UniProtKB/Swiss-Prot annotation:
One of its GO terms (cellular component) is cytosolic large ribosomal subunit. This is Large ribosomal subunit protein uL11. The gene is rplK. GO terms for biological process: translation. Transmembrane segments: none annotated.
């Protein structure tokens, strides 16, 4: 018989830096999950990813307090900021441009995010990432 799902917990945790402090501790503590077990498993799984990069994770908690989790790719905005070499996006994206990214960088980000995005092809996903870049105040160059 399949285990009964008790809850889904969605978090963004820095790669390789999961610890029992907020937001991980309170979110999993409410569900009765062994927090240290999750932290060790998450840190082991994200070992190959650049430390500190925020990784979305969906944790499935079962009624017997066991859990499984799925990691996703980092948010497009984080990858764009990293590619442009900026700390944050523009407060007025249509007026103040804060950086530049090339179309090749945008395509590379789209290919990285392909597993998580619901686009029909890489071109559609690239256009979606370009829109995110523009809304952050980045200029997309050829």
């Amino acid at each position: 018989m399949a285990k009964k799902v008790q809850a889904y917990v969605k978090l963004q945790v820095a790669a390789g830096m999961a610890n029992p402090s907020p937001p991980v501790g309170p979110a999993l503590g409410q569900q009765g999950v062994n927090i240290m077990e999750f932290c060790k498993a998450f840190n082991a799984k994200t070992d190959s990813i650049e430390k500190g990069l925020p990784i979305p994770v969906v944790i499935t908690v079962y009624s017997d307090r066991s859990f499984t989790f799925v990691t996703k790719t980092p948010p497009a905005a984080v990858l764009l900021k990293k590619a442009a070499g900026i700390k944050s996006g523009s407060g007025k994206p249509n007026k103040d441009k804060v950086g530049k990214v090339t179309r090749a960088q945008v395509r590379e980000i789209a290919e990285t995010k392909a597993a998580d995005m619901t686009g029909s092809d890489v071109e559609a996903m690239t256009r979606s990432i370009e829109g995110t870049a523009r809304s952050m105040g980045l200029v997309v160059e050829d």
